[in-house]
From Swiss-Prot:
This is Large ribosomal subunit protein bL31. InterPro entries: Ribosomal_bL28/bL31-like_sf, Ribosomal_bL31, Ribosomal_bL31_A, Ribosomal_bL31_sf. The lineage of its organism: Bacteria, Bacillati, Cyanobacteriota, Cyanophyceae, Synechococcales. GO terms for molecular function: rRNA binding; structural constituent of ribosome. It comes from Synechococcus sp. (strain JA-2-3B'a(2-13)). GO terms for cellular component: ribonucleoprotein complex; ribosome. Part of the 50S ribosomal subunit. Keywords: Ribonucleoprotein, Ribosomal protein, RNA-binding, rRNA-binding. SUPFAM superfamilies: L28p-like. It holds the Pfam family Ribosomal_L31. Binds the 23S rRNA. One of its GO terms (biological process) is translation. Belongs to the bacterial ribosomal protein bL31 family. Type A subfamily.
Length: 74
């Protein structure tokens, strides 16, 4: 016989909320799940890629410290 009060409350219709809008329902141990990103607005799933950093880290380092990036001639 299973013990009473051992398992958490199960919510079969828990709301997933993104930007104040209910985007889907899932089963969870919490009645509401607040998320910043979900498959409906993530660039990988929507196909709309955004370029966040157009300059690479190495180029930024080279520019910051005044290095040309080439090897010195002997």
């Amino acid at each position: 016989m299973p013990k009473k009060g051992l398992h958490p409350q199960w919510y079969p219709e828990a709301k997933v909320i993104c930007n104040g809008e209910v985007v889907m329902t899932v089963g969870s141990t919490k009645p509401e799940l607040k998320v910043d990103v979900w498959s409906g607005n993530h660039p990988f799933f929507t196909g709309s890629q955004k370029i966040i950093d157009s300059e690479g880290r190495v180029e930024k380092f080279m520019r910051k410290y005044g290095m040309s990036g080439g090897k010195k001639a002997k």
